[in-house]
């Protein structure tokens, strides 16, 4: 698949192995995994970071290669059930952080055309994602602007 704002090809990667059951060596109880997921979320980790920590560190020393196979739930579903879900979806939040950084850079360096273009592309991605999440994760009348992004991220950190 191609990249969104360039003519280059996307990067290919290996596929996840097809498996219906977790490996025998990873026999941790699903409740213990859920507790660890909530604990990591309360420490401020995002869902993707939680998955990597469980893969690398595991629960009680045993790595968890795939949370969904071990618990039959995604990390975000577990967080929803325990009311630890972040206010903004992770991908949208990361794009907003990037747009804020770029906007502040472009305000200081008005001659930087490459980063002006990068800001335009990032804001386009945000608007596209916002239309996807609108109504479910975001308010029905949500429209992106720099001020709204700053306000949302400051409210989330507080």
Swiss-Prot record:
Can you cite an annotated GO cellular component? Answer: cytosolic small ribosomal subunit
Residue ranges annotated as compositionally biased, kind Basic residues, are 1-10
The UniProt keywords, alphabetically, are: Ribonucleoprotein, Ribosomal protein
Query: Source organism's superkingdom?
Result: Archaea
Q: Which residues form a coiled coil?
A: none
Would you identify the family this protein belongs to, as annotated? Answer: Belongs to the universal ribosomal protein uS15 family.
HAMAP family xrefs: Ribosomal_uS15_A
> What is the protein name for this chain?
Small ribosomal subunit protein uS15
Q: Which organism is it from?
A: Haloquadratum walsbyi (strain DSM 16790 / HBSQ001)
